[in-house]
Regions:
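Intrinsic, low-complexity N-terminal interaction/targeting segments
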Residues: 20-34
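Short Lys/Arg-enriched alpha/beta "domain-start" segment
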Residues: 1-23
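Generic C-terminus detector
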Residues: 37-70
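Generic recognition of long tandem-repeat/solenoid scaffolds
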Residues: 1-5, 30-35, 51
């Protein structure tokens, strides 16, 4: 499920530090991956995200808001 809630750049260092307590996080200059079980979230610098583990838009948006912010 692709989500694009933010329309501003994402600071991977700041988001990564905030996500560490919630599950494994990896990132480079192009992508941040986060695994809040049972989901997998891939975040891009422009704010887009791909959330695996659900086909429900409401769940995907809720996960995005919870972990990335709106």
């Amino acid at each position: 499920m692709q989500i694009h809630e933010r329309h501003r750049p994402v600071d991977f260092l700041e988001v990564s530090a905030r996500l560490q307590p919630h599950g494994p996080v990896r990132h480079n200059d192009f992508v941040l991956k986060f695994w809040p079980q049972p989901y997998e979230m891939t975040l891009f610098p422009d704010g887009r995200a791909i959330i695996k583990g659900t086909t429900d838009t409401a769940v995907a948006r809720s996960l995005y808001a919870r972990y990335v912010g709106s």
